[in-house]
Amino acid sequence: MAAQGEPGYLAAQSDPGSNSERSTDSPVPGSEDDLVAGATLHSPEWSEERFRVDRKKLEAMLQAAAEGKGRSGEDFFQKIMEETNTQIAWPSKLKIGAKSKKDPHIKVSGKKEDVKEAKEMIMSVLDTKSNRVTLKMDVSHTEHSHVIGKGGNNIKKVMEETGCHIHFPDSNRNNQAEKSNQVSIAGQPAGVESARVRIRELLPLVLMFELPIAGILQPVPDPNSPSIQHISQTYNISVSFKQRSRMYGATVIVRGSQNNTSAVKEGTAMLLEHLAGSLASAIPVSTQLDIAAQHHLFMMGRNGSNIKHIMQRTGAQIHFPDPSNPQKKSTVYLQGTIESVCLARQYLMGCLPLVLMFDMKEEIEVDPQFIAQLMEQLDVFISIKPKPKQPSKSVIVKSVERNALNMYEARKCLLGLESSGVTIATSPSPASCPAGLACPSLDILASAGLGLTGLGLLGPTTLSLNTSTTPNSLLNALNSSVSPLQSPSSGTPSPTLWAPPLANTSSATGFSAIPHLMIPSTAQATLTNILLSGVPTYGHTAPSPPPGLTPVDVHINSMQTEGKKISAALNGHAQSPDIKYGAISTSSLGEKVLSANHGDPSIQTSGSEQTSPKSSPTEGCNDAFVEVGMPRSPSHSGNAGDLKQMMCPSKVSCAKRQTVELLQGTKNSHLHSTDRLLSDPELSATESPLADKKAPGSERAAERAAAAQQNSERAHLAPRSSYVNMQAFDYEQKKLLATKAMLKKPVVTEVRTPTNTWSGLGFSKSMPAETIKELRRANHVSYKPTMTTTYEGSSMSLSRSNSREHLGGGSESDNWRDRNGIGPGSHSEFAASIGSPKRKQNKSTEHYLSSSNYMDCISSLTGSNGCNLNSSFKGSDLPELFSKLGLGKYTDVFQQQEIDLQTFLTLTDQDLKELGITTFGARRKMLLAISELNKNRRKLFESPNARTSFLEGGASGRLPRQYHSDIASVSGRW
């Protein structure tokens, strides 16, 4: 290093053999070099190679020599020259600590083999590129200053701690029109990933909400008031108020940091409660993300599937701007509850594009098929191109942030390294990053098939729905510690959804398997639609879901927090309470949830322990996953005893089907607080004491397997006790009384005393079912009614989520009796022709639910005088008739139009359509009833049993009060 102080220090710049690029960092050829080069210039075996070495390592070598702590550069290169018989030119006058970060060049001359050997010896000590990567991430330009910090303090600290160089775009200083969001991080893989996480934690978190207008003279709250200052200091947030122009009221802005997310959420909730009081729960919270417009389509996915999935999962609304709007064209708005907005924000950030770049040695050849397999299994895009004028290849790996670990895993596989160099420890803490982002094995989007394929980056053929009967062994070949794909049982194919990451599977989860879902990979769009169609889209409603409408995983997690320590059993990852679709073996989850909740930690469903269901398709299980998207509505009392009894019979098909309901469909409304989480006619048949715990308003989607498969299972069921039938009849009587009570005009002189007569029966027209229905109707969200109105087919199909009409026999479990386990399937003498619309039954089995629909009743109970409906109908008005026919949900429609029974008997099919009865099955029921009643009315005066007491409504609407002892209803559809 003495050369630095000599007058010849800058002489290299004017050396005839140097150029402007070399400066002091380039090799300075000595006289000996020139002589040797000149003597052998024309030798055919002579070659010369120029390559870069790591500047920091060379500086460290020179520094150590100057301090007498190691050998000098001169000694190092001289030794190599002697051993390889080559000439080496190197920048001996390299300035230590210079501003330039460029790596200096080394030039080696000699025979080809000698040059190659010398280069390997030099690079073994001074090489950096083989383990150096560059990561380009997307950070909103509006937040660059916040990340950099005052005087660059924030980013300097990150660079020092991670050993990386972080570069923010210089073009943003001068270009006001187009701002770049790209931030580059260069360094070792572990440091680069750590820096990425740290940058995300430095991002600001801003939540906003509108203060309700209490009055014209209401002043804007003072942010300096003691209470607000106390909240601000306690939770380390800043609070400001913005007056809305031309309107009364104000917008509250809460600012915090991403690494303080939990405190920001708590502080915002406290502030809401302080400022809005009882209205706090009804006020939506909003935030916004600045995402480059060119990434919007990529993030939304095909047909918006990605965003829909996030909205349904979190319950937040997400609004992307109109691309034609020049102002704020990059701002994405999120609205919902505090929790849902923060979670949706994290999921969106997890969808931001990420690019990893690194060099590969020129001699390394990679099979294109291997690259294709890596791209599919790791959900990444890989591009390899040769570098001009350099003996190496440039590799570019693209993916999204939630899949970051897999990008390093792809690098490990391509370079043949033993480790990716990145550990899960570099992931953000659970407080700052929700499960599913930094730990992609818990990724909700990938688990629903919404990886890069869903985002539109990869082709449709790469969707990882493996329909072969043998597991894909690629991951095992890459890493022996990786959990294998689930092995199919009994030769049954076991398709899998998107594979979890290699880097994480050894310590987290394995592959999820969904039994009996045989859909080819080309049907991805269809699969996505099915997955999403039946799940209520909370994202479309501004208010947060009512208390009973929280997703089922929230209730499961509430059980986990009761000291049972089963989060690992549910999730396969100890730090994450998030449950992903399809991540848990569907045949045994419910049982394991119960076992774990009862303090039995021996049963867990970690990914490495998952097994396929052991049941045979002949047991009626083929429909187990068909209704993955159908809404469900279990109660949420947390009564694990009842739940255990219901889910633990020996019937695998029922347990599996109900578990799928629990995982996939329970985002429908929990309309009534009752004691059962799941219910099924088959299970209830063996549980008479529990059969009546479920409120009638809690809907169940109909699930009946094929007749041949069900008969053998139902044959041994115990007969129903008569008191259960009487209870069912009593319920219907109460329903009629409730309808009449609501229609009755209040009498001023009458004292009305509240009672609990209707408690728990779900008859209210105001809370909660009707309110939820009106709320969803206002937001164009489909509402699945309590009362079904169509003829249901006994077989199930994928179209059930869109179409509820199936002509034919077999009633679905949406009706009250089926849900309470007293449907036709509970009779001991159940006929073999369950699927037939005209099944015959013995007189002993003709109880209150002996018919599954109107046609069954007509065919099986019509007497010689044809007065069956006449005899069963002893009511006095239209609501009672509709209740008998299972059409109670349409009562309000006719009451609003002031249509009484007499007018109803004159209606035609076209009239019913105009009234809004669009469902074919319901109209057919009504028309058959009209026809039957009119026919009975004509026969009334000819009948010897005609009585003198008639119903109200005029001569044309008179019906006798004759009651048939064997019939409580014309229809089993309540």
Curated annotation (Swiss-Prot):
| Classification via CDD domains | KH-I_BICC1_rpt1 (cd22420), KH-I_BICC1_rpt2 (cd22421), KH-I_BICC1_rpt3 (cd22422), SAM_BICC1 (cd09520)
PROSITE patterns noted in UniProt: KH_TYPE_1, SAM_DOMAIN
Q: Name one GO molecular function term.
A: RNA binding
Residues with PTM Phosphoserine: S26, S31, S43, S576, S612, S679
Effect seen on changing E932G: In CYSRD; may impair splicing; hypomorphic mutation
Give residue spans, biased composition: Basic and acidic residues.
690-703
Residue numbers spanned by region Disordered: 1-50, 593-644, 665-719, 783-846
Coiled-coil positions: none
Where does this polypeptide localize? Cytoplasm
Question: Where in this chain does the record put each KH domain?
Answer: 132-199, 284-348
Per its UniProt record, what InterPro entries does this chain match? Answer: BICC1_KH, BICC1_KH-I_rpt1, BICC1_KH-I_rpt2, BICC1_KH-I_rpt3, BICC1_SAM_dom, KH_dom, KH_dom_type_1, KH_dom_type_1_sf
Query: Which cellular components does GO assign to this protein?
Result: cytoplasm
The processes (GO biological process) annotated in the record are:
determination of left/right symmetry; heart development; kidney development; negative regulation of canonical Wnt signaling pathway
Q: Which residues carry this modification: N6-acetyllysine?
A: K398
Q: Name one Pfam family in it.
A: KH_BICC1_1st
PANTHER family annotated for this entry? PROTEIN BICAUDAL C HOMOLOG 1, SCP160
Return the similarity comment: Belongs to the BicC family.
| Subunit | Interacts (via KH domains) with ANKS6 (via SAM domain) in an RNA-dependent manner. Interacts with ANKS3.
What functional role does this protein have? Putative RNA-binding protein. Acts as a negative regulator of Wnt signaling. May be involved in regulating gene expression during embryonic development.
Q: Which disease is it linked to?
A: Renal dysplasia, cystic: An anomaly of the kidney characterized by numerous renal cysts and apparent disorder of differentiation of the renal parenchyma. Kidney of affected individuals lack the normal renal bean shape, and the collection drainage system. The cystic, dysplastic kidney contains undifferentiated mesenchyme, cartilaginous tissue, and immature collecting ducts.
Protein name, per record: Protein bicaudal C homolog 1
Gene expressing this chain = BICC1
